[in-house]
From Swiss-Prot:
The lineage of its organism: Eukaryota, Metazoa, Chordata, Craniata, Vertebrata. It comes from Homo sapiens (Human). Its main location: membrane. The keyword Transmembrane helix applies. InterPro entries: CD99L2. Residues 22-142 are extracellular. Residues 47-57 have a biased composition (Pro residues). Residues 28-133 are annotated as: Disordered. GO terms for biological process: homotypic cell-cell adhesion; positive regulation of neutrophil extravasation; T cell extravasation. This is Glycoprotein Xg. It is a single-pass type I membrane protein. Expressed in erythroid tissues, including thymus, bone marrow and fetal liver, and in several nonerythroid tissues, such as heart, placenta, skeletal muscle, thyroid and trachea, as well as in skin fibroblasts. Expression is low or undetectable in other tissues.
Amino acid sequence: MESWWGLPCLAFLCFLMHARGQRDFDLADALDDPEPTKKPNSDIYPKPKPPYYPQPENPDSGGNIYPRPKPRPQPQPGNSGNSGGYFNDVDRDDGRYPPRPRPRPPAGGGGGGYSSYGNSDNTHGGDHHSTYGNPEGNMVAKIVSPIVSVVVVTLLGAAASYFKLNNRRNCFRTHEPENV
């Protein structure tokens, strides 16, 4: 019975030795990268795609690849939205991107009025200010929260193993003095 198991094992080992002896395996083949890796796009909003190619039956294209941009509406006289030549939020909104949501006021009872801490528009740190929509605050939270989680879990594991080890040590000890 033993010889029947030995013969297939010997044949399998010979097959493995033959496969190993090919010498055509090289780790450098896996590391060669003929084209450089492109840097990923890190924009908040994706870049718009170029418009579609014009259709032959469309008379507006005029043979151009890109259609002409629509002219901006002329400002109406007497409109106070853009008076004085100053740049404001209305000038910035050209309709390409969706509007960003406004931060919600803090929930809770109480009336309006002024805060005792002042009304500064500083959203880049400090106490009693919202970090909603703040890229610096969100980036710090993305970095710090996993580190804090790992430290807490490590401390809990160390404490549990320490108390379990002390429980085993003290299992057979008596608190009475030894009698010789």
